[in-house]
Amino acid sequence: AIARPVPTDSIAPLFRRRSNPDAFERISRTVPGGFASIERDSTGRFVVRMVDTTKADTIRAALREPFTAGRSPVVKAGILRELATARAERVSWSMAQLIDWNDYVATFVIGGPAVVGVGVNVHRQRIEVDVADENGPDVVEARLGSRRIPCGLVVIKITGPVRLL
């Protein structure tokens, strides 16, 4: 069973939220431990990334349902075995926190010709703002400069203009 929502230092109350979060976002928002992601390492083993690794067992248990729903009994058993031994890795930001910061940042940078995209990179633990050209970083920095966003959380990448196909 999923625990009741955990109080966080979320900035979500500052702006309107998207609706219909996926299963992983729901786990991040409701299960203690600050779930960020689940990935495979270079050896193929599951790694569960979270803010508080002392809550690893709780997060692993919460991941069982979304990872096994609709799977055959044999596949389900294999996944459950792997989840039980998944390595816990500490990260700075939960998925929910990254999504909230992304939505907050987007409210200030979307809407001009300089910015072509904004998104969460959960693996790299950051918000990525894609800009059209070399003037874009200055525009983004001017829009975000007084917003008290944590240092290193936002990365600006020059990707070029959007091209319609």
What are these regions (language model features)?
Residues 1-19, 78-93:
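N-terminal presequence-like segments and adjacent domain-start helices
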Residues 2-4, 147, 158:
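Compositionally biased, intrinsically disordered/low-complexity regions enriched for serine, proline
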Residues 14-21, 53, 134:
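Soluble non-cytosolic domains of exported or imported proteins
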Residues 18-20, 24-31:
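Short, flexible domain-boundary/linker segments around small modular repeats
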Residues 29-98, 111-142:
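Short glycine/threonine-rich beta-strand-turn micro-motifs
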Residues 101-104:
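PDZ domains, with a preference for the canonical peptide-binding region formed by the helix
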Residues 108-109, 141-145, 153-165:
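Substrate-binding/charge-relay-adjacent region of secreted/lumenal peptidase catalytic domains
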